[in-house]
Amino acid sequence: MMELQGKFLIAMPHLDDYFNRTVVFMCEHNEQGSMGLVINQPTDLSIAELYSKLNFMMKNDRTFGNEMVVAGGPMHTERGFILHKNTLNAFQHTYKVTKELSMTTSADVVETLGSTFAPEKYLVALGCSSWGAGQLEKEIRDNAWLVVSSNDQILFDMPYEDRYAAANQLLGIHPYNFALAQVGHS
């Protein structure tokens, strides 16, 4: 079985549905299936707006940058998934993804965002991407996805619109090369 947990999946150019030009961070991969978060499709909702909509009691002043909530995938779009650097905080529903990263689905992590208690780095997603047992492996064999080790700079710091090209460049591929490969093929 391929080891995909903690890696990026890069959509091949022929995927023309929801996953066109996406990068997915794989949060879980085992015999039962796979789950990940699209990291380069921002919604129109900023994390600050999400925080105010959830109406948390603001005990401290909150500082938010320009981070947007991303559309993590077409499944469970009403549910929040926070991928973050590991922290000493004991959040209720946290799943350790790698030695350095965890995913939390409970509101207690959201309550810390913008405060000194927040994880050092985090990505907030609505929805997730999931595959049944063996489904993702088949898609990889069918050349729907490229697999590459993840990178914190791409995951947390890079502008959303640059993440697809940067993930491809981890493999030495420039997305422009994909466009050239399509010329003359119908």
Curated annotation (Swiss-Prot):
InterPro entries to which the protein is assigned, alphabetical: AlgH-like
Cellular component terms (Gene Ontology): cytosol
Domain of life according to the entry: Bacteria
Family designation: Belongs to the UPF0301 (AlgH) family.
Record protein name field: UPF0301 protein HI_0304
Native organism taxonomy: Bacteria, Pseudomonadati, Pseudomonadota, Gammaproteobacteria, Pasteurellales
